[in-house]
Amino acid sequence: MAELTLQERLQPSLLDRLTDDEPGNLKEAAERRVLTLNQLKASVLRDLAWLFNTTSLFDHGPAARMPAGNSVLNYGLPALAGHTASSVDVHAIEALLTETIATFEPRIIRSSLRVRAQLLPGEMDHNALSFEIEGDLWAEPAPLRLLLTTNLDLETGHVRVAQGERRRT
């Protein structure tokens, strides 16, 4: 198989490319300008954790439907702390997570994105919800499958994102 050109290799996110970890070094090494598949997955996992743990400027009312609602001004999720699992609409949170990922994480192919609540009675806490996020990451030569588990603590609003594992039924 022919080696991929520099344009075809996986590049770090724009934020990672703009961040200078070595300001004294005027030239960046070639291996810092491209990512491996594992580095890409780790980068997306980190960025989703940042996204979910940031409170958006607008709630999902009329202001969120204005052009600024889909801009970086509204990066993050609405405040979710202070609820109990029985008082929230789980399907609405699934839709909220799906739309937030589709808007702010372009490396996940939108048509492949699926967010599902994990409503397993023995594993649920009354103040926490768990979601499975599944999708394909854009990559060359072929998309890369991504499976994540997301735990939302409704008391604090903190979200933990981890690499998921397919459950056997």
UniProtKB/Swiss-Prot annotation:
Disruption phenotype: Deletion mutant does not prevent TssB1 assembly into a sheath-like structure. However, the sheath exhibits an aberrant phenotype and break itself in smaller pieces. Keywords: Cytoplasm. It comes from the Bacteria. InterPro entries: IraD/Gp25-like, T6SS_TssE1-like, TssE1-like. The keyword Aminoacyl-tRNA synthetase does not apply. GO terms for cellular component: cytoplasm. It is found in: Cytoplasm. Core component of the H1 type VI (H1-T6SS) secretion system that plays a role in the release of toxins targeting both eukaryotic and prokaryotic species. Plays a role in correct elongation and stability of TssB1-sheath. Functions downstream of TssK1 and prevents detachment of TssB1-sheath and its premature disassembly. Once bound onto the sheath via an interaction with TssB1, provides an ideal docking point for ClpV1 to be recruited to the sheath. Interacts with TssB1 (via N-terminus). Interacts with TssA1. This is Type VI secretion system component TssE1. It comes from Pseudomonas aeruginosa (strain ATCC 15692 / DSM 22644 / CIP 104116 / JCM 14847 / LMG 12228 / 1C / PRS 101 / PAO1). The lineage of its organism: Bacteria, Pseudomonadati, Pseudomonadota, Gammaproteobacteria, Pseudomonadales. The gene is tssE1.
